[in-house]
């Protein structure tokens, strides 16, 4: 018989120790990976609920199993809140991840071999936008577009490529681009060649929900996102659209039964909580601070003589180009990690090094802002990072910086 006082600590000491170690790491490290965030205890409560036991293939009111009347309520709450949050008529909250949401869009709108215009991974795109190692690059004819010498999306190139190649779908969105996307211009280009316009807003969904970054939903045929990152919910995916019932039916079928079986009802409950949190005024205030902190960090890096791809940031992330410093992204990642500052190595435009080494790092502000960093804190943090990068291999600098990191982490805990 199952008892509610069963716990991991008493039963599986090895697993419990690993979980505790990760808990300590999160509290004692500064998290700057742009795709990570801290979700609320309310979201974690939902994910640890008995909803995890329920199979619910299908959609609310149209399930293949009985006993779904209450999980129908949960999913309907998530759907309605997602639509309200982003101004959408349709939402599918079942994708297990952003990549699976993207896969569903491909399946719904395209046939294998169709031509797709997507942002080059080397210029800030995502694996699912056409990388040859991903399903998108293996199954479809991908034409990449990129950024110009000023670090802005080259819309003239995009339009010329669209006219030349006549893609069936054009993808907007990114994983490492720090500027504002002109969704209206992209839709104009798509309409000019009769293509679907699909936006993956995973990185900026929280900013969009708060109104501090342009919303693609009014412009795109279909929009996807993750529900973590800037949105700060559970790890999962979401599909949105305003383009009519025919498209909604295709998207639903592409998710289930096309790509997934039963939805993760405990995660959908977590999404419902996160969407409610994102509708609160405090969430907008948080997102405003996210952008302000990223800008404060960029200003300090520039003042210290570092190159920033695109020269600035208008969202939550930026890329530090280390080519002229003769430091690899891999080396910078490791050095900063030694001081309890977590970033990720990242390719920069025209990077001469492999994706496993790279010549840059990607820096994001959602997590530090979530734990209460001010603009002054963010500026100081960028300075500490420059200290380490200016003195690669100097253990005294690393140790001094680590002490500062531990002090601010103690002052600003993730979970107070």
From Swiss-Prot:
Pfam families: SHMT
Keyword Cell membrane among record annotations: no
GO biological process, one term: tetrahydrofolate interconversion
Positions that bind (6S)-5,6,7,8-tetrahydrofolate: 121, 125-127, 245, 354-356
InterPro entries: PyrdxlP-dep_Trfase, PyrdxlP-dep_Trfase_major, PyrdxlP-dep_Trfase_small, Ser_HO-MeTrfase, Ser_HO-MeTrfase-like, Ser_HO-MeTrfase_PLP_BS, SHMT-like_dom
Gene3D superfamilies according to UniProt: Aspartate Aminotransferase, domain 1, Type I PLP-dependent aspartate aminotransferase-like (Major domain)
Catalytic activity: (6R)-5,10-methylene-5,6,7,8-tetrahydrofolate + glycine + H2O = (6S)-5,6,7,8-tetrahydrofolate + L-serine
Record-level Gene Ontology MF annotations: glycine hydroxymethyltransferase activity; pyridoxal phosphate binding
EC number: 2.1.2.1
Positions of post-translational N6-(pyridoxal phosphate)lysine modification: 229
Needed co-factor(s): pyridoxal 5'-phosphate
Primary subcellular site in the record, as a coarse category: cytoplasm
Keyword Lipid biosynthesis in record: no
Site positions for Plays an important role in substrate specificity: 228
Subunit structure: Homodimer.
Record-given protein name: Serine hydroxymethyltransferase
Organism: Aliivibrio salmonicida (strain LFI1238) (Vibrio salmonicida (strain LFI1238))
Encoding gene (name): glyA
